């Protein structure tokens, strides 16, 4: 019999022919059957039959009743267990056939951490600096630190992106993907010394719309020192040589124009390099021609500026609103103060230095972290020759303080930018079944379409709410004197109005309505004259309400199809009644 039912119910045409909202109450919890009252003894019967009057004396007081013996738990009948297994078979068969919307997955937990990507060398532990910090109120900061050489990424035009990072696990390099919310760049994105060209990663971050310090646009512009020097030339023309003493410089796009210079010695800088690399001091015209031949092999640009016999170098840095000035003096006598031995000390911050760094911090839309480098010559004059961005190295005795300043600056920028740019979550379909109709389901449960019939066994619906051609199966009401039979007249709808608070019946309030009806029944003091419905009848009734289909599903059809469906249901009910009746 079960195999027959499984084959019958696995047929997609069987469930597809069910009318809208027909199988609903199988998902409701089964009402607990009250335990049968214990058989009253003759003394208890006479006591219950006597009116509750005051006892005139202690001799007429009834003896205390002994505690009733615990009654055994009611054993489920064979029909009840059979219908339970049949209900499970119906659910499994319909779910495997794809006729029921898959339950929506539980929503993912809200992200309680923002991912910060720090591009820096491994000697700086930025995770320690951000430990315990929070952004946007209650979001932790998860730090992912790597060098440019360990990173890769993919970005899409819709704003989705993913960053791949190589990490060492048990001595083996593996790739791990994550999605950063903010980027702090503390490493040069381009350098010709070791073919370190990571501008494609900067482009990818800009493509993904990642906020960063400094801005990705400024970082890309700093990948060519002559381009940055052109901005210094514009500042020099605006402020003048007294306020902004910029060194003289000549730019050569290639070696062809490197013929001669009027004065020597000069410093030739080839290409874009850092830490003094690619810089050559040229004493005469012959050495300059030799350098021009080297530039021809590099196939890049070069600049030449007069050599300044310096007493010390000056570095003025700005991190947010914090300013520091340093002086570096060479001890070994090398013309490059960063080569050999040198003495570094912090000096007072003057208004002149502050003007330099404040003016340079406005280039390329604003620099949150920058530094101005200058040379103080033996002639007593200052010469500005370079500006560094957020990739500047930290120097001096206050490196820990500078890292703390950068940490606070990053947190401030994350609170400012991430609040306006929430992270995009990948959109995933919640249901596997697509509705055939073009209408969308109304989230408001009070706006129930008129063609939806009430759940079987629930409170009645006015006649005007029933669709034409819909044949409703007979309703079985629980026994009770307070529940009048349902009819199609207007008096029936008005009499059932007090039992239907809150408008039309929906799936959400069907269990509460049935429970309120059950509470309205008075308890039976005497043995009932009408037998209670058999559990099998309740089960057969609930079998037709196994699933809850939405208004936008595929069960809408014309009146003729509704009549055919109703005829199928009537024949099905007759089959169940003949199969499972006693």
UniProtKB/Swiss-Prot annotation:
UniProt entry tagged with the keyword Transcription regulation: no
GO MF term (any one): ATP binding
Top-level taxon of origin: Eukaryota
Organism from which the protein derives: Homo sapiens
Renumbered residue ranges of the record's region Disordered: 16-84, 420-545
Region (C): 113-420
Description of its domains: The A region binds phospholipids with a preference for negatively charged species.
Family: Belongs to the synapsin family.
Chain intervals with Low complexity compositional bias: 43-52, 462-474, 485-523
Signal sequence bounds: none
Predominant location category: other
Subunit-level organization: Can form oligomers with SYN1. Interacts with CAPON.
Known disease link: Schizophrenia: A complex, multifactorial psychotic disorder or group of disorders characterized by disturbances in the form and content of thought (e.g. delusions, hallucinations), in mood (e.g. inappropriate affect), in sense of self and relationship to the external world (e.g. loss of ego boundaries, withdrawal), and in behavior (e.g bizarre or apparently purposeless behavior). Although it affects emotions, it is distinguished from mood disorders in which such disturbances are primary.
Entry GO terms, CC: glutamatergic synapse; plasma membrane; postsynaptic density; Schaffer collateral - CA1 synapse; SNARE complex; synapse; synaptic vesicle membrane
Protein name: Synapsin-2
Region: A, residue numbers: 1-29
Positions where Phosphothreonine occurs in the chain: 421
Region spans: H: 458-533
Taxonomic lineage: Eukaryota, Metazoa, Chordata, Craniata, Vertebrata
Annotated tissue distribution: Central and peripheral nervous systems.
